[in-house]
Amino acid sequence: MRRIPVLLPFLLLVALPCAGLAQEAPRDPPPAASEAAPQDAEEGTAPATDAPEAGAEAGDAAEDATTDEDAPVPAADDPDAADAGDTKVPLAEIQRYVLVYRAIKEAYVDAVQDRELMESAIRGLLLDLDPHSAYLGKSEAATLDEQTSGAYEGIGVELLQQQDRSLKVVAPIDGTPAARAGVLAGDLIVAIDGKPIAQVEGMEPLRGPAGSTVVITIVREGRDGPFDLSMQRETIRVTSVRSRMLEPGYGYVRLSTFQADTGADFRQQLDELLAQSGGRLRGLVLDLRSNPGGLLTAAVQVADELLDSGAIVSTRGRAPASDTRFDATGGDRLQGAPVVVLVDAGSASAAEVLAGALRDNDRARVVGSRTFGKGSVQTVLPLGNGDSVKLTTARYYTPSGRSIQASGIVPDVELQPDPKYIGGTPPATALRTVTEAVLPGHLRGDEEEDGYQPGSPLPGDAPVSAALAELKKMAGKPATAAAAGGD
């Protein structure tokens, strides 16, 4: 069975084998959410397959388990049964499941397909674990495969599907129909083409042929009642790296997500900036605003281009193979020139890994607002019929050993949002209900604070100007001393 790790996020992806699963060489794919390419949930389409229905097969297996008279069945109230081992299958609980399964098959007022029952059962197993563990149907699983290629047909928005199936916008992707139509981080999509979210199949209705029209109904804090936004779907080719010169000697690189080619593209565009500056930059602004994450390996590659040595990130989980560490290989491409990392409340997962790595190594100063706080790693486990399970398998830690789960990264220099970009609402309102710490059932963070103040989205050019001003302050000082700072 091939494992496809994801970081999603809402997006942090890393290949992490699970105990007891046959392993193949892991491939380097996607993140975790999005209608587009990166992070924790999104729309997608995949061709139907002739694979046998998992429900019937699993149902038969469950029945076999109950008819084996020789199999020991622990009592439901036997404490030793629960403590016997974390990986032991609770046969008594499975018997209860089979009884309910049989009752539904034999007596429910309408016929129910095995696949529907099994899919619901699997969703139920994952529902209360954490917001990022989920059952992925064929279309949703196909979306993850599209995420690393950065090409798909849709509206271009990163989404998080909540337990009530509602869709929260993590961030619109730069230059896409969603961004042009005015979709904002923190928006709640309550209907698609007039149909309530509860009546549609996940995020799939957001996908469709390029040129077709879709209408989404949005609820936004600070606005009176729902409102509609109409947009035409496009073939979304997400360019994850863009760059330009802000002023002579001062470069700017925008990373919108982390895809398979992000590391190579970053290196190429950094070299172009260096060439424009006679081989040496006075400083660099690295813009990670509204970057929902993506491939962990891509974030590691970008960090490695800016570090001579030191740890970049480590991951730790229950399975031994979940414990990994990534170190810089040497060769700072900027030769110590100062770096400012620009973040906001939409910076999540792999984006937080990069920001944390550069700051903990005293290589950059972080400017902006508090980040999302997604410090977990997801692994995608294919089920053999086109469906998959996305399971949280590890937490990641910055070089200082700190987990940002449900706490985020607090910048060295905090900026306030321009109210005109968030409908005149007070700072922090737009993303208040979509940060990791307020997601129902989120993993408790090591440094999580009750009632902490979440960050804000920081759209527009003003934050870039503020980052450049900070960069100029640093430019006349040794990079290490200038970049020092902490939470």
Question: What kind of region is each of these model predictions?
Answer:
Residues Q95, R242-D487:
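C-terminal "post-core" interaction segments
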Residues R2-P5, F10, C18-G283, S290-P292, ...:
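Flexible, low-complexity junctional segments that flank or bridge functional domains
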